[in-house]
């Protein structure tokens, strides 16, 4: 039934504890540490394909102090003493499965799972069944080559009919994308929201907010609650 022993919050907190200990006692770090693993090993059921640009995961922030420290890192990177005028593109995190959609000449030709971040599973045929994913884009400003990245998920209201098979919507989305028969995947009400990109040969956008707007114009669904916010404390 794909039932995890820990919920996401418990897992994230344990991972944070491990990262803290490794930072303090570096000799504790091992190759199997969560700090060195992104996602999961690709399944043997599907063909493995390397991402043209690594598909990394996001770090967690558990409280306001974590956010302030994040902004301090930005200041240090930019060699700034202090500032609360940075603009942040923010949107709620969708609890689903990350996917990378490869487009060439406007045509969706391949879809990959995150896998371990470097190498993903070729789940193209299953992704083809999702209505939210455009299969052909004719916009003149659409790049010749681009990897559109986003989240595959199941809405809570649609999960009601799947409770007997899966522990939660995220596991349902994951299991559905790993079906051997795409017709079985098609029966599941999967959704897709785009939010970033991997490889792109050429694209003219100034910032993340502009990119999200461009995605909408190309026909991709984006998070309706995304906002541009000034200052980390206004998040």
Where are these regions (language model features)?
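RNA/tRNA-interacting regions in translation and RNA-turnover enzymes
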Residues: 1-235
